């Protein structure tokens, strides 16, 4: 596999629980709210699983836990298990990588985050992802 990590240098978009980035000087309590959602990871995990499974109906996905060993089109249950392992207290400082070869897009799920990051998505892919996240109460935005 080519070096997909070069995609981390490309433009990226965020799939998030919030419709836009919270300003650093916000009067709200972003970090407390984020911790609230992180304590309820199973619900957030289910949303990410449903989005990625639906996306997998349209595109092949290669999934990796270490960035070296990749598996093409995990069974739905295996994809759910992999995402759950990371979002529900998986390896500290670890990420789960989903590569969409046809789109040359890398999706990263960080174990301690309430979002997924899409690196180098095409406009067509962004349009599809925006449609898929709506039923889950998620949003897509560019930092």
Language-model segment annotations:
Residues 1-115, 119-143:
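Structured alpha/beta or helical-core interaction and ligand-binding surfaces enriched in interleaved
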């Amino acid at each position: 596999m080519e070096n997909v990590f070069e995609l981390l240098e490309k433009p990226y978009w965020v799939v998030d629980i919030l419709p836009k980035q919270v300003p650093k000087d916000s009067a709200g309590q972003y970090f407390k709210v984020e911790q609230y959602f992180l304590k309820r990871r199973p619900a957030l995990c289910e949303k990410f699983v449903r989005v990625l499974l639906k996306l997998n109906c349209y595109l092949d996905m290669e999934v990796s836990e270490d960035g070296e060993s990749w598996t093409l089109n995990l069974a739905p249950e295996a994809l759910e298990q992999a995402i759950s392992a990371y979002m529900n207290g998986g390896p500290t400082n670890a990420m789960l990588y989903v590569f969409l070869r046809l789109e040359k897009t890398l999706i990263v799920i960080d174990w301690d985050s309430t979002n997924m990051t899409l690196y180098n998505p095409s406009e067509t892919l962004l349009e599809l992802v925006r449609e898929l996240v709506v039923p889950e109460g998620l949003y897509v935005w560019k930092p």
